[in-house]
């Protein structure tokens, strides 16, 4: 037996040597295949887009988002996808750190803490080439994101800067350049491509046209007021309808930019080995949208496509996932170790068609948008209800922000003088109440605050208890204040500290 074993070993060795000698010229290709086995990662975001502005998520405007809809057919659509903080920079930095803003240091529009580990940092160490297109200044400090490709900074006179992250053909051109870099370097890629549509200024407005050296609408189309739908959380009056048409024109232009990115990926030949994640950073910049804690603030049109892994055309309406889960999910997908302090949890099992426990509640936060102004809010959502606590609502402090600077808010203020229903909505938006409760199953637009309805007393108690539990889990510094909210001066003292903190945050107002 021993002799036969030695003979077998010799024969196997000779066969191996022959094989290596005969195919030595192909060894580099074998090495490339092993490297390419690790998937590329493409994160695509849009700026200030409400979830149901997308055809695949319920928008009825014909032809509004054909490219996003096509992506949904190729992957999995999440009907309970959320972001955790409904303002640009904190939302985006949470996605790439797996941490709430109060844990990564970016509560307002300021750089996060230098000791926080980012997703591109970990991918860079694993051999990825990293790139970013659009919203570049919202990843700070810049060195923590390890960008290899950032034409916004490296090509200061380039057409990319002149396009302001809103030109579809530019996304195609610059994405293709990056994909070629990946192929030339023989490195898997990580690209974050961020359309700055449909952020204000909306497409076709005078401010939008003046921000370009050419007409950006030459690559898109302009929707008319009679072609669009006004969401139920806004009054359907002429000025609102006019601005909503401009918003939807921006939504469509964003979709064309996404189409450019996906076209470049397809033509690069790397699409079959690429994980694609699509989402919005927060809801639209209208009253009761962005910079709040409502359904239309935090729900995002989340889509994940991964050829050969995610079953095309699937829909998950059961599990709640959020922005802080993105980094853990990507790390799980590419088999890299997790950060032990992460707030988020991987939802890779869902992408593989499995069920997952502890995916029913989502905790959302809000801190500030403009410098020196803070409106701290917290919310907990389950599959039906949402409970919101507004630390700032004292009956005197008035809400202001990105949503109160446009035509819609001005029109609402004017209409409120004669229309009591609009006046009620305006007044509530400005001053709010400390607590809010909504039945999103029957009232997704948060039109009826149920906090004082005795029929929901038990539900309110459960959600208050859940809020405390989640605040502990996510190390929210507002925990003790919320717990002791009914004690004298607790809220007022907390708000004094918030105002002091606001003086040193929110410096980066290019949101």
Identify what each model region corresponds to.
Residues 480-493:
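Short, charged, surface-exposed hinge/linker loops at domain edges
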Residues 10-21:
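Bacterial N-terminal signal peptides
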């Amino acid at each position: 037996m021993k002799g036969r074993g030695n003979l077998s070993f010799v024969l196997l060795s000779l066969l191996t040597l022959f094989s290596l000698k005969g195919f030595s010229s192909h060894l580099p290709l074998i090495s490339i295949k092993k490297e390419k086995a690790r998937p590329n990662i493409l994160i695509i975001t849009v700026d200030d887009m409400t979830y149901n502005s997308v055809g695949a998520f319920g928008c009825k405007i014909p032809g509004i988002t054909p490219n996003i809809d096509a992506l949904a057919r190729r992957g999995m659509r999440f009907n309970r996808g959320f972001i955790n903080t409904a303002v640009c920079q904190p939302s985006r930095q949470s996605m790439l750190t797996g941490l709430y803003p109060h844990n990564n240091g970016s509560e307002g529009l300021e750089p996060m803490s230098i000791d926080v580990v980012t997703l591109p940092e970990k991918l860079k160490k694993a051999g990825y080439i990293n790139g970013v297109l659009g919203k570049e200044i919202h990843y700070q400090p810049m060195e923590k994101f390890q960008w290899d490709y950032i034409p916004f900074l490296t090509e200061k006179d380039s057409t990319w800067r002149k396009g302001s992250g809103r030109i579809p053909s530019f996304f195609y051109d610059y994405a293709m350049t990056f994909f070629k870099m990946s192929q030339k370097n023989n490195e898997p890629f990580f690209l974050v491509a961020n359309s700055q549509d449909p952020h204000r200024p909306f497409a076709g407005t005078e401010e939008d046209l003046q921000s370009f050296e050419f007409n950006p609408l030459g690559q898109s189309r302009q929707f008319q007021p009679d072609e669009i739908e006004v969401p139920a959380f806004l009054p359907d009056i002429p000025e609102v309808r006019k601005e909503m048409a401009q918003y939807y024109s921006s939504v469509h232009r964003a979709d064309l930019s996404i189409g450019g990115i996906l076209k470049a990926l397809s033509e690069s030949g790397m699409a079959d080995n690429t994980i694609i994640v699509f989402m919005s950073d927060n809801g639209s910049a209208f009253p009761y949208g962005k910079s709040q804690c409502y359904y239309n603030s935090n729900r995002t049109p989340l889509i994940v496509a991964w050829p050969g892994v995610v079953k095309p055309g699937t829909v998950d309406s059961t599990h709640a996932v959020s922005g802080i889960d993105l980094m853990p999910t990507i790390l799980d997908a590419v088999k890299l170790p997790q950060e032990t302090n992460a707030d988020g949890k991987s939802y890779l099992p869902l992408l593989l068609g499995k069920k997952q426990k502890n995916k029913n509640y989502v905790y959302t936060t809000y801190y500030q948008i403009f410098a020196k102004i803070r409106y701290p809010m917290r919310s907990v959502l389950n599959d039906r209800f949402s409970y919101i606590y507004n630390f700032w609502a004292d009956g005197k402090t008035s809400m202001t922000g990105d949503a109160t600077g446009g035509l819609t808010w001005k029109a609402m203020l004017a209409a409120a003088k004669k229309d009591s229903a609009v006046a009620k909505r305006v007044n509530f938006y400005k001053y709010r109440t400390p607590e809010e409760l909504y039945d999103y199953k029957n009232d997704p637009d948060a039109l009826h605050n149920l906090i004082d309805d005795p029929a929901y007393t038990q539900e309110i108690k459960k959600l208050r208890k859940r809020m405390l539990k989640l605040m502990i889990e996510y190390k929210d510094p507002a925990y003790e204040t919320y717990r002791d909210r009914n004690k004298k001066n607790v809220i007022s003292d907390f708000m004094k500290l918030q105002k002091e903190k606001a003086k040193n945050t929110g410096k980066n107002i290019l949101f």
